[in-house]
Amino acid sequence: MNRLDDPTALFALLCEARVGGRFWADPAGLARPAAIVVRPRRIDDISGHLDCMEPAERRAALWIAPSAGRQPAQVFDRLVAAEGGAWRGDVDPWSALDGAESLVAHGDDEWVALARFAGTPVQILSPGRFGTPGDDIAELDQQAARALGETTYRDPFSGEEASITATIDLLAEWRRILEANRSIAAACGMAWWKRAEIHRFLWNPQRSLRIVARPSRALTVARRAGGGVAIWPSRVSPMLIETARRQDVPLIRVEDGFVRSVGLGSGLVPPSSVVVDRLGIHFDPSAPSDLEHILATTEFTPRLLARSSALRATIVAAGISKYGAGATVAPPPRQDGRRLVLVPGQVEDDMSVLAGGGGLTSNLELLRRARALEPDAEIWFRPHPDVDAGHRKGAVIDGDAMGVANRIVRGPGMAALLDCVDAVHVLTSLTGFEALLRGREVTCHGTPFYAGWGLTRDLGVVPDRRGRRLTLDELVAGVLILYPRYLDPVTGLPCPPEVLVKRMATDTARNRLGWIAPLRRWQGRLMAALR
């Protein structure tokens, strides 16, 4: 049982989060707020309601049908045709109660409690858990608070008892995701092996997401539904983007998150985190993105920054990077008294390199530029794992790399390497952000998403949009908490980043397509041998 020390504050929290009741249902879609919201228990209740209402109230009423189906629809169609007002079926209660002057309902209807959370006056028709005819506002509020306090809440990820505030926070995040997903009608460019996760990330309870192969079909589906198309940027053509612009169909870009999975995407490991961006995409500095907007405008609260700091500490302590917890192989010894710089290679035709590299795409050239800036340093070169696996472009012959670097490091996990170096030189690699988490110096030769906020040495062209100076915890809050979405690999539910990080740290983030990994490794070795 939850002890409610301040019901008023809790009501305000619920009202702000707009959770409780069937909040995942479609919004009421009212042109103006309803003067009175009426909730009959059964169809045959309607005549009794009408007897208690003035003609003006009937004309301004919003009727909520007690059940779905053809017969109720016909009854309410005739009702509003004769009396005025409007009716809705299964709707989000918060959207129906917005601005309403009163609610008329039975005492066992949870809408009574929701109305009181929202501060809406209520008329009770019959006694029940949430009120009795004649109850005043204070009595109704006590009943609503009692109902909240008598409920036991459980964390869906751990099964342990949870506080009501933690439950509200989780439901509020789910609501935010669902509302964002309502405008997505179709998806295109989604690889077959990640489609199950894409369905979960973009789930809409009222409309199944159509994932289609042909861009023209995706645009047709979206136009008919009045929605947008979710795309994977590297798997769609410029023609789709131009056609969508001409047809005024919004494109929503979906890309891997920054703490992604245990295993490589090129190894067909489905993502446990993605970003869903309506403005652009984080790796393209030529245009605004949702991440840029978040970092430039968010008022970071002390509570959010404390959460960000704790998340960063957990990630660093557990040795987690984009593709999971680091390997147990220890890094090689470094030279005593000499500055140690890590240069991570990238996939040379990766979209982040093409968009944010400022024309530089060569891993060998990146190494040379790092050496020019660090003539006395010990430099370690880390080939990109997708390239080393033989799946992607960007291989540097070891002899060429050793003509510039002091060592090529492949075995240890990235987190372990970052723990032992002094600085990192990157083009646009996520490794630069992971280095910032660990307090390392970062030099950006391109313009990654974390450049331009006052935390890196920036050699690339930084957009004026990034003039704000951020602390590390503010950057982490935007990049890891506010921008991405996460799926719990155990339950399949949307989760906070802390849950996924814990699964990775405890080795419970298993790949559902583990059977295909050996095949992909064999394919990668074959492709590497043929190059």
Feature-to-residue mapping (PLM):
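Short, charged N-terminal beta->alpha structural module
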Residues: 9-11, 46-55, 68-78, 178-212
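Segments forming glycine/polar-rich beta-alpha architectures that bind adenosine-containing cofactors
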Residues: 199, 208-270, 321, 358-359, ...
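A short, well-structured beta->alpha microelement
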Residues: 21-28, 51, 66-67, 77-96, ...
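A donor-sugar binding/catalytic signature common to diverse glycosyltransferases
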Residues: 93-132, 231-240, 255, 411-456
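Catalytic donor nucleotide-activated moiety binding site of glycosyltransferases and closely related
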Residues: 57-90, 367-410
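Short loop/turn segments at strand-loop or loop-helix junctions that form parts
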Residues: 38-41, 65-67, 126-127, 255-256, ...
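Leloir-type glycosyltransferase catalytic cores
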Residues: 1-36, 132-192, 265-335, 454-531
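Histidine-anchored nucleotide/phosphate-binding helix
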Residues: 42-63, 240, 356-373
